């Protein structure tokens, strides 16, 4: 096998195992970043029902901006 052919075949490393965002168990490659299909579906359900939301102020003049000083 020629040397230039070996250099072209680069293998990428797998992602690091991270804790599942739902239960904390090590993540599974098939369901990444979750550990199982159940945890993946629980997270999807929370997105679809609106459990994950960015809080907004009804009136912009009453909004708290932590970076600004009064």
UniProtKB/Swiss-Prot annotation:
<feature type="binding site">
    <location>
        <position position="20"/>
    </location>
    <ligand>
        <name>Zn(2+)</name>
    </ligand>
</feature>
<dbReference type="GO" id="GO:0008270">
    <property type="term" value="F:zinc ion binding"/>
</dbReference>
<protein>
    <recommendedName>
        <fullName>DNA gyrase inhibitor YacG</fullName>
    </recommendedName>
</protein>
<feature type="binding site">
    <location>
        <position position="39"/>
    </location>
    <ligand>
        <name>Zn(2+)</name>
    </ligand>
</feature>
<comment type="function">
    <text>Inhibits all the catalytic activities of DNA gyrase by preventing its interaction with DNA. Acts by binding directly to the C-terminal domain of GyrB, which probably disrupts DNA binding by the gyrase.</text>
</comment>
<keyword id="KW-0479">Metal-binding</keyword>
<comment type="similarity">
    <text>Belongs to the DNA gyrase inhibitor YacG family.</text>
</comment>
<dbReference type="InterPro" id="IPR005584">
    <property type="entry name" value="DNA_gyrase_inhibitor_YacG"/>
</dbReference>
<feature type="binding site">
    <location>
        <position position="23"/>
    </location>
    <ligand>
        <name>Zn(2+)</name>
    </ligand>
</feature>
<keyword id="KW-0862">Zinc</keyword>
<dbReference type="Pfam" id="PF03884">
    <property type="entry name" value="YacG"/>
</dbReference>
<dbReference type="InterPro" id="IPR013088">
    <property type="entry name" value="Znf_NHR/GATA"/>
</dbReference>
<feature type="binding site">
    <location>
        <position position="35"/>
    </location>
    <ligand>
        <name>Zn(2+)</name>
    </ligand>
</feature>
<comment type="subunit">
    <text>Interacts with GyrB.</text>
</comment>
<dbReference type="GO" id="GO:0008657">
    <property type="term" value="F:DNA topoisomerase type II (double strand cut, ATP-hydrolyzing) inhibitor activity"/>
</dbReference>
<dbReference type="GO" id="GO:0006355">
    <property type="term" value="P:regulation of DNA-templated transcription"/>
</dbReference>
